């Protein structure tokens, strides 16, 4: 069983008994409708969290035709899928199996490891997944399917196959109907015209909702959907058994006669989260929320109005201002949403008007968002990603004993991690190394609060540089002609920004390593 599967199994057991969210699998998603943003774009994205990670992440382009019509794809854990046409080209953030072993399933068979998010050549965007967990009661009626689709396959299959968001929704829900799901999840599927969010909490149930332009919601591993009228067929796609499974489990909350279900209450229960409280404080511009003084059901998504009528989707979260892309970035940087357990973060910014080639911007970041700068890419124009995103490196070595050589750190649970010699050659590796140095120190040497403040300030300044670079990139792309010139302008600009983040991070890491070692040497002389 892989690390992710083990963590997920432990999470389910914990959630069933204690109804708390451990940090090891603690992703957080955000959606802000276009009516609520400064420039009228829709913004949505997610942080992938994995506690203390020991393997590399990549960001690359999956070429068109990587999978061929009729090819049977075998995923990590037994799920198979037959491609209906040659696969589309798409951007992808993914786990690194470049040295032959998949870090998800520990397998060497040829397959694409977990891909978290991306955009295909048709302009379809997928973010998968926000891990969700049904209660033991509903899972006893409709359990997860061992060889059903799992998060490691969702992005790969949907971006390879779907030409519109609705096609993606139809494909994913048909897979849930037939093959089933290996786990619960929340998935964004979008195109230039619409954004859908799909939640499943058992093996074969699901609810897909077309999101409105006037809603904002966040999701820290809890079902985001509350009271939903399933008769709103223009905006809702639901499994035929959604109500009946909850009824059989004895957990149904809603009005079956009116075809209304409270999904969160029926399938997920009320789970306290310090990330939800922190996110609400950020969105409201206050510090009054704690995980003990709110109910996440108060902020769940609904399409049912006060009089029971179907209304545009809302969440009861009220922003204090129109959001900019920097506001969305700062949301992900808010602790404990941002933390050393972050693995990668992606934020899609989508304009409903204009040329599709520039209507979608992917903002990408790796590792700890507290100390980070996000880089923009035009996925429809990008022909390649920066070389530092594509470097395969060895895994970090874990141990219960203090290492006697190499560069290592000890995490909060007392476990030791030693970096391979090539770790900082990759974009993810150097970002991870700096984050762990700022959080845990290195080789027993600690950093100071002043060091952490300086790192935050450096990344804040770097983000402002990137925002200026992004403005220059937009102007250069607009002026370029023909299409090949636009592609070159976009690709070169984004890759230069990525290289700038890498170079800055490596310099900060090496400087801070030397500083902590010097402090330790001086301290040893004094004592």
Task: List where the protein language model places each region.
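Charged low-complexity "KEKE/polyampholyte" interaction tracts
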Residues: 369-370, 379-527
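A contiguous strand-loop segment
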Residues: 27-150, 171-296
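Bacterial N-terminal signal peptides
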Residues: 11-19
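Long, well-ordered mid-to-C-terminal structural blocks that present hydrophobic/aromatic surfaces
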Residues: 294, 299-401
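Sec/Tat signal peptide C-region and signal peptidase I cleavage site
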Residues: 6, 21-26
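Bacterial N-terminal signal peptides that target proteins for export
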Residues: 1-11
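Accessory, solvent-exposed terminal regions and/or long lumenal/extracellular loops of proteins
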Residues: 274, 278, 282-340, 430-450, ...
């Amino acid at each position: 069983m892989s690390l992710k599967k083990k963590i997920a199994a432990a999470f389910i057991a914990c959630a069933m008994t204690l109804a708390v969210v451990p940090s090891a699998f603690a992703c957080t998603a955000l959606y802000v409708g276009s009516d609520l943003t400064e420039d009228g774009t829709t913004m949505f994205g997610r942080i992938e969290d994995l506690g203390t990670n020991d393997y590399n992440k990549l960001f690359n382009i999956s070429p068109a035709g990587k999978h061929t019509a009729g090819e049977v794809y075998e995923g990590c854990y037994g799920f198979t899928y037959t491609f209906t046409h040659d696969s589309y080209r798409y951007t992808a953030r993914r786990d690194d199996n470049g040295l032959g072993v998949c870090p998800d399933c520990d397998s060497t068979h040829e397959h694409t490891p977990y891909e978290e998010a991306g955009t295909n050549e048709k302009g379809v965007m997928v973010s998968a997944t926000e891990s969700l967990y049904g209660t033991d009661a509903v899972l006893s009626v409709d359990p997860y399917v061992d060889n059903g689709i799992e998060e490691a396959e969702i992005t790969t299959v949907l971006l390879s196959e779907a030409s519109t968001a609705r096609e993606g929704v139809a494909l994913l829900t048909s897979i849930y109907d037939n093959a089933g799901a290996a786990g619960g999840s929340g998935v964004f599927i979008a195109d230039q015209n619409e954004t859908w969010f799909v939640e499943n909490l058992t093996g074969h149930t699901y609810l897909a909702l077309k999101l409105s332009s006037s809603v904002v919601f966040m999701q820290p591993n809890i079902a985001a959907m509350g009271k939903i009228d399933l008769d709103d067929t223009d905006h809702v796609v639901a499994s035929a058994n959604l109500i009946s499974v909850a009824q059989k489990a004895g957990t149904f909350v809603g009005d079956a006669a009116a075809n209304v279900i409270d999904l969160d209450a029926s399938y997920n229960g009320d789970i306290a989260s310090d990330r939800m409280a922190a996110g609400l404080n950020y969105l409201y511009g206050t510090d009054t929320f704690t995980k003990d003084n709110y109910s996440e059901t108060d902020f769940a998504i609904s399409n049912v109005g006060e009089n029971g009528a179907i209304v545009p989707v809302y969440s009861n979260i009220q922003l204090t201002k129109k959001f900019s892309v920097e506001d969305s970035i700062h949301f992900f940087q808010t602790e404990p949403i941002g933390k050393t357990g972050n693995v990668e973060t992606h934020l899609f910014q989508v304009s409903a008007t204009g040329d599709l080639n520039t209507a979608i911007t992917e903002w990408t970041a790796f590792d700890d968002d507290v100390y980070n700068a996000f880089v923009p890419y035009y996925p429809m124009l990008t022909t390649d990603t920066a070389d530092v995103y594509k470097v395969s490196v060895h895994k970090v070595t874990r141990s219960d004993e203090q290492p006697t050589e190499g560069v290592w750190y000890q995490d909060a649970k007392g476990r030791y991690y030693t970096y391979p010699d090539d770790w900082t050659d990759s974009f993810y590796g150097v970002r991870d190394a700096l984050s762990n140095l700022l959080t845990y120190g290195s080789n027993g040497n600690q950093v100071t609060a002043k060091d952490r403040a300086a790192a935050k300030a450096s990344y804040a300044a770097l983000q402002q540089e990137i925002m200026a670079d992004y403005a220059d990139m937009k102007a250069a792309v607009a002026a370029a002609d023909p299409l090949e010139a636009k592609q070159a302008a976009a690709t070169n600009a984004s890759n230069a920004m990525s290289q700038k983040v890498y170079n800055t991070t490596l310099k900060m890491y090496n400087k801070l390593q030397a500083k902590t070692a010097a402090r330790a040497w001086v301290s040893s002389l004094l004592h």
